[in-house]
Every structure is written in C-alpha cells, then in structure tokens.
Amino acid sequence: MLGDGNGGMSTIPGFNQIQFEGFCRFIDQGLAEELYKFPKIEDRDQEIEFQLFVETYQLVEPSIKERDAVYESLTYSSELYVSGGLIWKNSRDMQEQTIFIGNIPLMNSLGTSIVNGIYRIVINQILQSPGIYYRSELNHNGISVYTGTIISDWGGRVELEIDKKARIWARVSRKQKISILVLSSAMGLNLREILENVCYPEIFLSFLSDKEKKKIGSRENAILEFYQQFTCVGGGPVFSESLCKELQKKFFQQRCELGRIGRLNMNQRLNLDIPHNNTFLLPRDILAAADHLIGMKFGMGTLDDMNHLKNKRIRSVADLLQDQFGLALIRLENVVRGTICGAIRHKLIPTPQNLVTSTPLTTTYESFFGLHPLSQVLDRTNPLTQIVHGRKSSYLGPGGLTGRTASFRIRDIHPSHYGRICPIDTSEGINVGLIGSLTIHAKIGHLGSLESPFYEISARSKKVRMLYLSPNRDEYYMIAAGNCLALNRGAREEQVVPARYRQEFLTIAWEQVRLRSFFPFQYFSIGASLIPFIEHNDANRALMSSNMQRQAVPLARSEKCIVGTGLERQVALDSGVPAIAEHEGKIIYTDIDKIILSGNGYTVSIPLVMYQRSNKNTCMHQKTQVQRGKCIKRGQVLADGAATVGGELALGKNILVAYMPWEGYNFEDAVLISERLVYEDVYTSFHIRKYEIQTHVTSQGPERITNEIPHLEAHLLRNLDKNGIVMLGSWVETGDILIGKLTPQLAKESSYAPEDRLLRAILGIQVSTSKETCLKLPTGGRGRVIDVRWIQKKGGSSYNPETIRVYILQKREIKVGDKVAGRHGNKGIISKILPRQDMPYLQDGGPVDMVFNPLGVPSRMNVGQIFECSLGLAGSLLARHYRVAPFDERYEQEASRKLVFSELYEAGKQTANPWVFEPECPGKSRIFDGRTGDPFEQPVIIGKPYILKLIHQVADKIHGRSSGHYALVTQQPLRGRAKQGGQRVGEMEVWALEGFGVSHILQEMLTYKSDHIRARQEVLGTTISGRTIPKPEDAPESFRLLVRELRSLALELKHFLISEKNFQINRKEV
C-alpha cells in the first residue's frame, strides 16, 4: 500500500490480474465475436440451411476438479453448448437443438490452464501494431531514401518508396515493385479519381508516361499488370474471374486487412475519417500515404520510431485464444458442409446434433496448448517463478521476431518502456532483450497498448487523481520521475525536480510538472523488486539476480529474509502456494492433509497439498499454521507452502558470511561453507522424481506387468508386490526394478529349446518367448517411493496405452559442487566443506557459515550485497526485520549507509558487543583463524545476507563412465549424460598432451579408449592374463572413416607404417 500526504491511496494490483482479465475478455467478448462470424451453411441445391443462434451459448461447469485433472492427466475444461437450427426452405420447417461444440480449457486461480495433467501458461507477445510507418535510410550513395510501410493485421507488408525522380513505387514482393498508379487503378480508381484525391497531382502526372497510361487505361489492364508483377509470371496472362480471386486471396486478404487497431492508426497518422468498421486497405489510404511520403521528401512531417511502444501492441491470452477459436470454427464449417452434402447424397435426414462434431474445437485447443511457442509449461520451481512466468512479454513467436534476426536496436531499452517493461529483467543469451517482464503496475489496454499509472498534479484541486496512460499519451506531459518524498509533503515553488518529457530526461521547475510517478517499484518487474538496495548494483548483476531467484530451490526449513523490500507477502499470496481462508470461522479439525473450518452454519474442508512434484522435480508441500479451536478471519494464512513462511516468500536462509580469502578455496567465485549447514539440514531440500512406463498391445500379444521376471537376480526384484509394481515406502537403489514388464516376441528357430521344438513338431503349439522390458531405476535416482499411479485411458486400445508412474522422494543436503547465490548476482560453487572448528570465528566465538571472495564485489559493482550483509547482522542481533524500498537516496544523501551504520551501532550497544560497529572500520571486524586461533591481519566484513540454494545441483550433473555404448559410424563413445556417454579427447586436448610429451597416454586415448575396435577387444584379455597390451598395428576407425569419405570424393588416400627396427617404409593398403 502507498499513502501520501493528500490522502491518496493506491493498491498494488494482483500479479495474475493480466492473465485473468485476458481470459475473462475472451469468455465475455471473444467467443461471441467469433460465433457471430459463423456463416449460414446451405447445401448445393439450397434446400437446407444450417445456422447457429449465438445469443444462447453457454459454458458448463467442469465435471472434474483441478486436483483430479492433474492426478489423472486430464484437461481441466468446460463444455461449450450453442443452439443450432436446421431450416428446410421448401416447407419452411425448422429444427432447433442444443449442440455440443467442444471443450474449452479453463484458467485456474493461478492464471494457468491444465492440459493433459500439465500446467501450461500463455505468455503475452509484443507485435508491431498494424498501420503505416515512415522511415528514412541511407542508400549506397549516402542519399536518404524515404519509405512508408503499411503493416496489416496478419503481419503482411506493403512498402511505398519514393526515388530521386520523385516517382512513387509500391513494393509488393522482395524483388518486384509497381507504380502507385497501377496499384490504385487495380484497386478500382481511374486516373481522374486518383488526381482528385491527392495533394500533389502534378507530381503524379510527372511520371505518367505513355506506357503507364496504357497500363492504367482500364481496371482489367491494371489488374493484369499487377498480377504479372506480384506473381512474377512471364508472358501475357488473360484476365478472368479466377485470376481476380487468386489476387484477392494472395494479396488483398493477407496484406491489406488492417483490423480495428490498424484502421484507428491509419486514420490518426494520415488524418483520415474512414469508419472504424471498414478494416480493409482502401485506395484512399494508399493515396493519402503517398501524399505523406511526398511531404517527407520535402521535409514536412516526422519519421516514426518503430521501437516506440506506441507502435507496438500486446497480443494477450484473449487474442490468442480467440484466434484459435476462430480457426476451430472454420474447420467446423468445413465439417458441417461436408456432412450436409453426404446426408443428402445418401438420402438421410440430418439433425443439427448429427451435423456438428466436437473434434475440431477440442483438437485445435489441444494442439495450441501443446505446440504453440507462446504456450509454455509453467515453471514451478518456486512460488516466485510461477508468478513471473505469467508476466513475461516476448517479441518471439508467430508473426514476431527470431533470436537470430533481431537487431540490437530492438533489444535495447527504450524510453517508452518506462513504467511498462522492466529495464532489468530479461533472459540471458540469444534472447536477451527479446523476452522481457512487465512492471508491477503495468496493465494491458483495450486496444493492446501497455498502460502505466501516474498521479495527476493539479493546482486547483488538492485531491490526487490516478491516471493510466498509454505510451502515445504520456509523451506530452512533464512527468516528475524522482524526489517522491518532497512531492508527497507538498513541494515548494522554487524546487527543481528531475522529469521526463518526449523521451528525454530533464531537470525542470516544479510548476511545470503535470504528472508524477507514485511508487518506488513502478519501473521494475517482480523479480527486480525483490532485490534490496538494487540502486547500488550494476544493472547486469541485478539482471542475474532476478533470474537466479527464480532458480532457488524450496528448502525443507525455510526462513524469512531479515532484509527485504516489502513485496514478499504479496508474491507469496498471489502465487497460490499458501492456503488462505476464504471465509471467517473457527478451526474444528486440523490434520496433515486437510483443515476443517466452521462458521455461519457451514463447514468447509480445505485439502492441503501433500508431497506434490513440480515440473522441475522440486517438492510442493503445505504445512498447517493454525491450531484447532482458534477463530480465524477471511484472508488469514491457514497453511504455508513450499518456500513461504507466515505467508511471506522465503526462498533461502540468513547465513553468517565473511568476505575474505581462505587458502585459495574461494578463488574465482568458489564458496567455502561450514559442515553445520550439512548436519543441521540448513540447506537440505526435497526433490521428487517421476518414472513412468507404458504397456502396449503388440502384434505378438499384450505386454504384461508381473513380478515373475526370468534371468534376473531376486535382489533386484525385492521391492515388487505380487502385481509386479514397486511397493509404497520402499527404499530403492540404482538398478532396482520399479515395474516388472514382459514383452512378447517371436523367437528364431535356433533359439528354441529341444522340448519346444518337439511340441511344435508334434502338436503344432506355437511357443512364444518374452523379452524383459522392466522399468529400472537409473543412475542417481535412489530414494523413497512415495506414490504409484496406474492411469488407464478411456478406450483401452493400443493407441491409449496404460501408464504406470512411480514417484520417488530424494533428500539432498548441500554438497561440494552445488550452486549458491545471493540476491545481487553474487553466485558461486561450493568448493570445500570445513569442520566447524576450522572455520573463521567472531570475537564472541561464533564460527561463520560461509566465506565469500571479496574480489567478487568491486569488479562486479554489486555493492548492494555489502549493505544487505551488514544490515542483516544488525537485524539478527536486534531481532528485527527490515523492508527497504529502492532508491532511498530520494529521502537524503547517503541514506542507505546511514541506515546500516545506525542499526549496527544500536546492535552493538544493545548486545554489549563493541566489535559489531567499530568506528575505525565500520561494518568490519577482527576475526580469528579457527585452526590456529590467531587473528587475521585485516578486519573483515561479516554479516547475514540472504543466500539461496539454486536448482543447479551436482547430483544432477556429475557423471562418470567405465563402459558404455559406442556410436555405430565412428565407433567412438556417445556424448552426454543421458546416453551414458564419455568425454571426447578432441584436437585441442591432443595438443595439450603432445606439449607434455606423454606419448603412451596419448596412444591409449586415441586407440584403446576410443575407436580402435580390435585393440579395444584385446585389452580385457591381456589385463586378465597379466600380459602387456599389444600396440595396434593398423589405423583406428575414425581414420578409416576419413579414408572412406575421401573415396566418395574420388580421392584415394594411402598410409605407411614405419617399422621401429630398420625404419624401412612398408607400403600397405588401407
């Protein structure tokens, strides 16, 4: 909440609000708009007519709950019913029925959809807004060339360009261009009408040659010329109706449909008054665009900034779902048309219900959620990740850009992003700047523009009014950007404030200010707003921090941060992770899996999440926070979820840290930790892995789930029950059988036993053999079985196989190789775990928990971690929690430093520990070496920052290979952990070994351990018998492969082996 001196109050909007508003807009408006477009369908003889009555459409409440949909791998959807009528024109009879159109996936309370049991989210896309844009580019001679680009609603483009002779051309394809006169004439105007509707008729007449007059002599000639240039067809095409239809379909429908937004933009840019419902490009638009282009050539008018947000539009979840619904209705129209014709051909009497099938709508949405680039699997690593994922905005996707073609200018921060798109939070790598995050207060307007709130400053009225402005409106106001404290307390007349005006940042007098920003977090996304003292960090490190907070693993024992920003509670509540009371009442029963609440004559049972797996294998679990018999109010937290404590976000731990070098173990961002973090389960987390197997019906018969698996040791089958499925609560190790399965197969004659052959010869009995295809626990999967699910799809055919899933819980302590990070981009890998007695200790005898490298601070310029570190120490000693808003220097100079030093001073005073704040080196203290007891030479910064354990864990990455598979072509080990691959000794590694002269090791690496087949086979025998390994006498397989490839190019390569005894060259064929 934000209060100001004038009594104005503003609430931070719900972080899922953009998703909810988009889906509601689709249900309320989008469905009806598309249904109204559904045409009346007639048969060929025009005797029967089918139509939908849109006014009576209804969505039915889902038949299953969200939790059941996830558990059974179903889609959480609603059935759509519409009234449809079949009219017989001869008798004027009409049959009306309620028709089931299909299933529409619904949005749940998290702003996500559940499709086939998987949480999916649709992210917002930023596209170029349809309309016309003028720009200037230098050609190869250094002369400015002016162009006007008309962008359609579907992304198609028509470019108008003016050459040095002031002739205007329309570029209809990459290579071909035609005269503006031919295009206007093809669209239906004659020469007289063209000259009457332009401002510069003499320029148009100046490039009208005899050849041009012939082309625009009639509309047919103009269409033929246009068709010839557009399709690049030679010869002389003949005018026909089919030619007009083809041109209409390929050009005018794809490149000339502006849509409602495009029509508004065209009218505004070209000063036209064409009705808004006329959404196609008209000849009048083309001529007005040409007039403006001529004006640009003569220095009149302004060029457009293509990267300004006023020239962009947001394609939200509503637009994407509506597009898919329209596509499904087109498919349904084709189905109905074909069914009517088929019924009449077979002399059947159709009914509305028989004509319509639900398949087009259901399959369209399933393919959209499963295959569309903007529909993504919800990242559920922690509560913050769930919230941030739904607020992403992407330039990528259909109709947008690609990571390889986007320019630096598009990726860069634009002044119009202020208060709308976060300047910090973006992805790292090839998509940097293309995938951003919406700011906290940004919202999407009705025409797809991003709006940001401001307070209006009025001299007449003392009331504060909040305005939401689109990017094209706030350019014309003087907006005060800083010094919010002075603005709240009533500004003096002579005050000078920083402000923003027309994409420039200025310093102006207070009287000129018309609007002001009202919230410190207004410019940042959620991830960046959770970084305390963000103003003291370099932007690159803040970017890393906002990304790494989304990678934090929920810990078994979470802890609230001592130093925060105040947004932690709202992030946790909006994520849906904690259980919140929807009504007030009294707790009458609590359990580990449910809470029963009674009040006002009703009783509500609230189920809790128990050991649920997220798609990143983290554990989602809720713990009861209320006691039986207590009265609670609406909105109170009943149970904490993963990474929440008391309804606040808790991603990490407050750990005692020292910034100092220690025997080189924290070189290059390595981190030294105490064994206390392991033994006391400080950074212990739970992970749930899912393993599944399917049973199919093969050509030899159905696969069987059984515990009777031949040729396997009993030890591997010890955890199976009588059905062949692993028992709940079993502890399983690598290689154990989780599901016993046999697949029937037809064996070869030679593999039959003698008694089987006798049975076949005498009785004709076909003996089938089965192959063992059990589900085995892979490497690194050891743990406790907590759930087994047997999912049987409807139908039971071979296309709907039965699926068995086994869920295994792992407990992971922190270990060497795990990645930890702070909230300022300070990340590192655990390099060594020291005994507590060897860790450096403070003057009160307490050992530190972590040792960071101090050299990681000055070069990275993330000084915010030092402020947080010292303030966290003061907070832990004083038992206080701090919530620090960003840019607190707006209150006074050096506000952050003053706050930290004053709290440290008070902590030292109250705890009678003078070492907490030493005036000679404030924030630093003398500490002692735990091994010797001697003090270190220099005072060291110590404190309690908030440190996170990230999902990049060594248990998921470490891999070793003793034996494994080889590639068939090169005979070298496969690549990657998943394939049990090995590391390849490449060209540069060979150079390094050559540099040390290790010839024997080099020979082993390139022959026995790699791709020399014969030598590889001889190694085992010679090792067992104790003989020396013979040296290979021929070339390895990769060299033979090179020779074969050269042979395919008609090049014969021969090689020679030099004898060690007499160095005679023995010539040998490859």
UniProtKB/Swiss-Prot annotation:
A molecular-function term among this protein's GO annotations: DNA-directed RNA polymerase activity
Keywords in alphabetical order: Chloroplast, DNA-directed RNA polymerase, Nucleotidyltransferase, Plastid, Transcription, Transferase
GO cellular component term, pick one: mitochondrion
InterPro entries in UniProt: DNA-dir_RNA_pol_bsu_ext_1_sf (IPR042107), DNA-dir_RNA_pol_su2 (IPR015712), DNA-dir_RNAP_su2_dom (IPR007120), DNA-dir_RNAP_su2_hyb_sf (IPR037033), RNA_pol_bsu_bac (IPR010243), RNA_pol_bsu_CS (IPR007121), RNA_pol_Rpb2_2 (IPR007642), RNA_pol_Rpb2_2_sf (IPR037034)
Compartment(s) where it occurs, according to its Swiss-Prot or TrEMBL record: Plastid, Chloroplast
Chief localization: plastid
GO biological process, one term: DNA-templated transcription
Family annotation (CDD domains): RNA_pol_B_RPB2
Origin superkingdom: Eukaryota
The protein's role, per its UniProt record: DNA-dependent RNA polymerase catalyzes the transcription of DNA into RNA using the four ribonucleoside triphosphates as substrates.
Family of the protein in this entry: Belongs to the RNA polymerase beta chain family.
Subunit description: In plastids the minimal PEP RNA polymerase catalytic core is composed of four subunits: alpha, beta, beta', and beta''. When a (nuclear-encoded) sigma factor is associated with the core the holoenzyme is formed, which can initiate transcription.
Protein name: DNA-directed RNA polymerase subunit beta
Organism from which the protein derives: Populus alba (White poplar)
Lineage: Eukaryota, Viridiplantae, Streptophyta, Embryophyta, Tracheophyta
